[in-house]
C-alpha cells in the first residue's frame, strides 16, 4: 500500500504543478487579449507622429515665409532709404535753382529799372 499511496501523492503533486502551469498560460492568454489596446495605442502614437510631422512641415514653411518676408522688408527699407536720399538731393537742387531764379529775376528787375530810369532821364 505504501507504493500505491506514494503513487497517488506523486500524481496529486503533478496535478498541482500542472494547475500552476495552467495559471501561467492563462496569464499569457490574457496578455494576448490585452494587445489590441496596445495596437490602438500604436495607431494613436502613429497618428500623433504623423500630425507632429505635418505641424513640423508647416512650421518649416512658415519660417521660410517669414524669412522671405523679412528679406522683402529689408529690400523695401533699402528702397525707401535710396528714395529719401534721391528726394533730399532733388530738394537741394530745387532750392539752388529757386535761389538762382530769384537772382535772375532780381537782375532782370534791376536791368528793367535801370532802362526805365534811363528812358525817364532821356525824356526829361
UniProtKB/Swiss-Prot annotation:
Classification via InterPro entries: Autophagy-rel_prot_16_dom (IPR013923)
Chief place of localization: membrane
GO biological process, one term: autophagosome organization
GO CC terms: Atg12-Atg5-Atg16 complex; phagophore; phagophore assembly site membrane; vacuole-isolation membrane contact site
Keyword vocabulary terms for this entry: Autophagy, Coiled coil, Membrane, Protein transport, Transport
GO molecular function, one term: identical protein binding
Pfam families xrefs: ATG16 (PF08614)
Annotated Gene3D superfamilies: 1.20.5.170
Mode of membrane association: Peripheral membrane protein
Location(s), subcellular: Preautophagosomal structure membrane
Coiled-coil region(s): 42-107
Superkingdom as given in the UniProt entry: Eukaryota
Subunit structure: Homodimer. Part of the ATG5-ATG12/ATG16 complex. Several units of each may be present in this complex.
Role noted for this protein: Stabilizes the ATG5-ATG12 conjugate which is necessary for autophagy. The ATG5-ATG12/ATG16 complex is required for efficient promotion of ATG8-conjugation to phosphatidylethanolamine and ATG8 localization to the pre-autophagosomal structure (PAS). Also recruits ATG3 to the PAS. Involved in endoplasmic reticulum-specific autophagic process and is essential for the survival of cells subjected to severe ER stress.
Protein family membership: Belongs to the ATG16 family.
Protein name: Autophagy protein 16
Annotated organism of origin: Eremothecium gossypii (strain ATCC 10895 / CBS 109.51 / FGSC 9923 / NRRL Y-1056)
Amino acid at each position: 500500500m505504501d507504493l500505491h499511496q506514494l503513487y497517488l501523492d506523486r500524481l496529486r503533486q503533478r496535478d498541482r504543478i500542472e494547475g500552476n502551469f495552467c495559471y501561467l498560460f492563462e496569464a499569457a492568454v490574457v496578455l494576448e487579449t490585452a494587445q489590441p489596446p496596445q495596437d490602438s495605442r500604436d495607431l494613436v502614437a502613429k497618428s500623433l507622429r504623423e500630425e507632429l510631422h505635418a505641424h513640423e512641415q508647416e512650421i518649416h514653411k512658415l519660417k521660410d515665409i517669414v524669412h522671405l518676408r523679412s528679406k522683402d522688408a529689408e529690400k523695401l527699407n533699402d528702397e525707401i532709404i535710396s528714395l529719401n536720399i534721391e528726394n533730399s538731393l532733388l530738394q537741394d537742387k530745387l532750392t539752388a535753382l529757386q535761389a538762382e531764379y530769384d537772382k535772375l529775376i532780381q537782375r532782370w528787375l534791376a536791368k528793367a529799372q535801370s532802362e526805365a530810369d534811363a528812358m525817364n532821364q532821356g525824356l526829361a
